[in-house]
């Protein structure tokens, strides 16, 4: 059950943002950007999801360079200014460590602009000194931040004889959390008489046609559709 996640997007937020035509914007650096892809344009997923993709902060151009850039002060402003935000949008900002410059600064910029900000991070890193000029953790700049329970270093298994832990968990737990948040949002809106548009599989009868209508409606607001 996603019941324990219900307070994350309370009814007022759903009514004020989704029911007023807002988009849910999702941002993360490195592997955290995977959660933006997880929620975007997929069967069973919400239509009004607008991912924030900045390719140098992803992995396919240079994975090692993306790690360097995530710590660069001021880059968040460059990314933020590339985007067009609506007053009814909501930002979900993902960073397991929650200490690096770009995600923390980006969340702060969104908050300062009046957007409600939901974070997904690991509380295990709260004891670590922030690596940004703000001196803040992601938890400090979000309206609410959900613990993804990733251990320090992300890897969760330490087989006997191995020097280094293996099996990172933040993507798995993060995907569960973000889908839980969205499920609660849809459920609350439905209870209030508003049906959030949802994609269906393009491999079922009529699915492709239905999805095409959704993309036609949202294409101007979500360019990467």
Segment roles from a protein language model:
Residues 29-182:
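Glycine-rich phosphate-binding loops that contact phosphosugars or nucleotide phosphates
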Residues 22-28:
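Short glycine-rich phosphate-binding loop at a beta-alpha junction
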Residues 154-158, 176, 188-211:
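Internal, active-site/partner-interface "lid" segment
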Residues 205-225:
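Acidic, Ser/Thr-rich low-complexity intrinsically disordered segments
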Residues 2-20:
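A short, well-structured juxtamembrane/interface segment
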Residues 3, 18, 43-47, 142, ...:
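Structural signal for hydrophobic packing residues in well-ordered secondary-structure cores
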């Amino acid at each position: 059950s996603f019941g324990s996640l219900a307070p994350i997007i309370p009814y007022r937020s759903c009514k004020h943002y989704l029911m007023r035509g807002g988009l849910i914007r999702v941002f993360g650096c490195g592997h955290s950007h995977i959660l933006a892809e997880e929620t975007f344009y997929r069967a069973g997923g919400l239509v009004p999801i607008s991912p924030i993709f900045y390719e140098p902060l992803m992995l396919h151009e240079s994975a090692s360079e993306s790690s360097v850039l995530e710590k660069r002060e001021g880059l968040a402003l460059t990314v933020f200014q590339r985007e067009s935000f609506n007053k009814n949008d909501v930002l979900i900002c993902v960073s397991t460590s929650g200490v690096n410059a770009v995600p923390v600064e980006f969340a702060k910029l969104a908050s300062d602009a009046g957007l409600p900000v939901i974070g997904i991070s690991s509380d295990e890193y709260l004891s670590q000194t922030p690596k940004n000029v703000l001196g803040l953790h992601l938890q400090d700049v979000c309206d609410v931040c959900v613990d993804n329970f990733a251990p320090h270093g992300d890897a969760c298994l330490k087989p006997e004889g191995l020097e280094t832990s293996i099996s990172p968990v933040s993507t798995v737990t993060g995907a569960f959390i973000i889908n839980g948040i969205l499920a609660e949002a849809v459920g609350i809106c439905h209870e209030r008489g508003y049906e959030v548009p949802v994609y269906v599989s393009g491999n079922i009868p009529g699915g492709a046609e239905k999805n095409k209508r959704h993309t036609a409606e949202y294409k101007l607001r979500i360019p990467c559709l």
